[in-house]
């Protein structure tokens, strides 16, 4: 089953990063395309910490599975819309994961597989839960996560400058450190948020 989980993680992360790159391309920035990142090749998107270490750490500690991939290169000088354009690029990835979770849930619901005990239902629920984990984790407003891109767009200049210094100084290591320090609180947040969204999905199909 670990192979299935890794395959779901990998596929979800690739589509997440493709969404970033495609929205950036639509807003005038061809950097991701020029560097070959608008690709389904997983090796172009893998990051050893966020793509491998964090998901495996969460899996083996029994926490909700989440992670990320190597950030798609963005040239903000080419991007239309300024900070709001960057916010759109940032939110595109998590929204893709949310939509993947919703589509997988709807397929599982209307085929009935998520209510059975067979392997198909298990795989569908992995797709749902992993993508919801990616969605929730990546919308956290912590640099350099995607949620911080939205915060950049609405934050006062002073707050934005502090965020930029944090991102330049610590990068993804800040996120990794927070996961280690606040693992219990983060797991609780992720589980509660995931359950809340699943309840929303059930309500959408009239099963709640």
Language model features with spans:
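Hydrophobic transmembrane alpha-helices and their immediate loop junctions
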Residues: 1-208
